[in-house]
């Protein structure tokens, strides 16, 4: 099992750099930085992380081809690869409709858009010209091939991830979700003449770890509430939860009733949408994900009640694998 960690660049960048360095020191192999217009710029953040670290692989987790053109992303990730001496990795997904509506961007044909974007970026990163004549001239990646991970959720995206990417970043925390997802990734990989072993299947989890299990759970409840609000009925049915659960949380959060939303998060929702607990409780939960085909565990928001302490505790977990 490989281990990655996610950071949202909404804090001072110096703090994020220190936390990523700590993560590197305790055994994390990947740092994923979210890319959203209302936070600090992902590539400027990554550049400073590259300067402040030595071995950890790093990249956006995830960007999208609507807000950023594939050519701009290719140039940015190649530059990051140079700055980090060959440690760049790229996460790209279809984005979310709510963000595009707010920006006035039309969200059309996500599967074919991602497919075309990855094809263009691979061409540019190889130093070749696209059919339309685009070519990177003043920047060249250190790696012969920068790994490209696809953020994927639905069946078509999961199959496409298996077909054209080096890894799949899946926003899920429960083995049941990977029991459903991994066969679709495998189907896509085999259709392209590859094996599922060629794809790094990453569980991008809602993670909260602490020596106090209750404190860990409490820190994750607001994140679980937002995950529930954005999940479609089939996901709830998979976990034996009422299909209208998402609607209920959407209404609570929509009117700003965060206390009500947190209070409505029960143990069943926590089990479905998060990995929380003490270090001893984490180990079997991560092992269960591995049994379903997960090959990278990503500690996503909130990480824990105290990020620095929680990263150190995750280091204890990593040492068990």
Curated annotation (Swiss-Prot):
Family annotation (Pfam families): Bac_luciferase (PF00296)
Biological processes, Gene Ontology terms: methanogenesis, from carbon dioxide; one-carbon metabolic process
Any GO CC annotation of this UniProt entry: cytoplasm
Principal EC category: oxidoreductase
Pathway: One-carbon metabolism; methanogenesis from CO(2); methyl-coenzyme M from 5,10-methylene-5,6,7,8-tetrahydromethanopterin: step 1/2
Primary location recorded for the protein, binned into one broad class: cytoplasm
Coiled coil: none
A molecular-function term among this protein's GO annotations: coenzyme F420-dependent N5,N10-methenyltetrahydromethanopterin reductase activity
CDD domains in the record: Tetrahydromethanopterin_reductase (cd01097)
Chemical reaction(s) catalysed: 5-methyl-5,6,7,8-tetrahydromethanopterin + oxidized coenzyme F420-(gamma-L-Glu)(n) + H(+) = 5,10-methylenetetrahydromethanopterin + reduced coenzyme F420-(gamma-L-Glu)(n)
The enzyme's E.C. designation: 1.5.98.2
Gene3D superfamilies documented for this protein: Luciferase-like domain (3.20.20.30)
Keywords in alphabetical order: Cytoplasm, Methanogenesis, One-carbon metabolism, Oxidoreductase
Subcellular location: Cytoplasm
Domain of life: Archaea
pH dependence statement: Optimum pH is 7.0.
Subunit structure: Homotetramer.
Summary of the function given for this chain in its UniProt record: Catalyzes the reversible reduction of methylene-H(4)MPT to methyl-H(4)MPT.
Family that this chain belongs to: Belongs to the mer family.
The protein's name: 5,10-methylenetetrahydromethanopterin reductase
Source organism of this protein record: Methanothermobacter marburgensis (strain ATCC BAA-927 / DSM 2133 / JCM 14651 / NBRC 100331 / OCM 82 / Marburg)
Gene field: mer
């Amino acid at each position: 099992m490989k281990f990655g960690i996610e950071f949202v660049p909404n804090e001072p960048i110096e703090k994020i750099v220190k936390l990523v360095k700590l993560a590197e020191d305790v055994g994390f192999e990947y740092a994923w930085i979210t890319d959203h217009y209302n936070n600090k710029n992902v590539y400027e953040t990554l550049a400073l992380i590259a300067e402040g670290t030595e071995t950890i692989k790093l990249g956006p987790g995830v960007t999208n081809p609507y807000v950023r053109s594939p050519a701009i992303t290719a140039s940015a990730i190649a530059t990051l690869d140079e700055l980090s001496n060959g440690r760049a990795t790229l996460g790209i997904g279809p984005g979310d409709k709510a963000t595009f509506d707010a920006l006035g961007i039309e969200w059309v044909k996500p599967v074919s858009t991602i497919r075309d974007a990855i094809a263009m970026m691979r061409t540019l990163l190889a130093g070749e010209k696209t059919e339309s004549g685009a070519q990177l001239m003043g920047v060249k990646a250190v790696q012969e091939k920068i790994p490209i991970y696809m953020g994927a959720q639905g069946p078509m995206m999961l199959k496409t991830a298996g077909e054209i990417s080096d890894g799949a970043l899946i926003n899920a925390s429960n083995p049941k979700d990977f029991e459903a997802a991994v066969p679709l990734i495998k189907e896509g990989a085999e259709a392209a003449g590859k094996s599922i072993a060629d794809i790094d299947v990453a569980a991008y989890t809602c993670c909260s770890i602490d020596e106090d299990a209750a404190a860990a759970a409490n820190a994750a409840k607001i994140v679980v509430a937002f995950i529930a609000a954005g999940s479609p009925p089939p996901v709830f049915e998979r976990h034996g939860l009422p299909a209208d659960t998402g609607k209920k949380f959407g209404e609570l959060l929509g009117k700003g009733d965060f206390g009500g939303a947190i209070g409505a998060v029960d143990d069943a929702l926590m089990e479905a949408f998060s990995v929380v607990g003490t270090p001893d409780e984490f180990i079997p939960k991560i092992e269960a994900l591995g049994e379903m085909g997960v090959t990278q565990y990503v500690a996503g928001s909130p990480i824990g009640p105290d990020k620095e302490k929680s990263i150190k505790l995750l280091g204890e977990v990593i040492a068990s694998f």
